[in-house]
Regions:
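Secreted/periplasmic carbohydrate-active enzymes, especially glycoside hydrolases
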Residues: 1-155, 159-168, 204-210, 219-220
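Aromatic- and acidic-residue-enriched carbohydrate-binding clefts of CAZyme catalytic domains
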Residues: 113-116, 170-209, 213
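Catalytic-core segments of hydrolase enzymes
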Residues: 213-214, 219-225
Length: 226
């Protein structure tokens, strides 16, 4: 999504570089306009990855990652830029004869061996402490982390899971936060009752999914707890 924060219309180029190849797409934005710009392999052949390096979890293969550099240029000058890291993998689920859900990673069954994660109660975790904890998970020969809530004060811990090959079963905002979200008290059964409440919570979940959507480590969102 591109946003023109200025009071004047602008014309520029959205430039992307992936694996040493570059594409450029012209974009026009009115003053104050936000626009979702979709680019597929039809417009940019560089996005068609032939024989991609697949992302695998710990003990199943390498956790291959790609990096795409994006920039928006106006009259040849960079207005904004960002590097997006992502992985290529396929995740599917299935049910056993007993009715339990299982997962397939790149077509192969994966036995999920998971640790649980909660943030430090005073939010004192740093990138260094996050990395130490993620390394502990790997050293215990586990391949997954279950975030009961949408933990992590930034994307750092999710970046680490991508790098170290740990599957992520991410949660959602817990019941005790709903009072602040909804602006009213909730009983033991929750407080999402009106259409307005439902729309608010749906937008909240949508924003969280968009925030983390590029992480190959994330294989499922569990909106229920325990």
């Amino acid at each position: 999504q591109l946003t023109n924060e200025s009071e004047q219309a602008v014309k520029g180029q959205l430039i992307g570089t992936l694996e040493g190849k570059t594409f450029s797409i012209p974009v026009s934005l009115a003053a104050g306009e936000s626009k979702i710009v979709r680019v597929t392999s039809k417009e940019a052949d560089v996005l068609h990855l032939k024989n991609p390096r697949l992302w695998w979890c710990h003990n199943m293969g390498k956790s291959e990652m790609y990096g795409m550099d994006l920039a928006f240029e106006i009259d040849g000058k960079v207005s904004d830029k960002e590097t997006i890291n992502f992985g290529v993998r396929e995740v599917r689920d299935y049910f056993t004869e007993e009715g339990y859900r299982g997962f397939l990673l790149n077509g192969k069954k994966v036995l999920v061996r998971s640790a649980g994660w909660t943030d430090d109660i005073f939010l004192r975790d740093t990138p260094a402490s996050n990395e130490i904890q993620v390394q502990y998970v790997r050293d215990m020969n586990l391949n997954s982390i279950r975030f009961e809530n949408i933990w992590g004060t930034s994307q750092n811990v999710y970046d680490l899971c991508d790098r170290y090959g740990l599957l992520v079963l991410v949660g959602w905002s817990c019941h005790w936060e709903w009072d602040n979200y909804l602006g009213s008290s909730c009983d033991e059964f929750g407080g999402i009752k009106s259409e307005k409440d439902m729309n608010l919570i749906a937008r909240s979940l949508n924003d969280q999914v968009l925030w983390l959507r590029n992480h190959p480590a994330i294989i499922a969102w569990f909106v229920g707890s325990d």
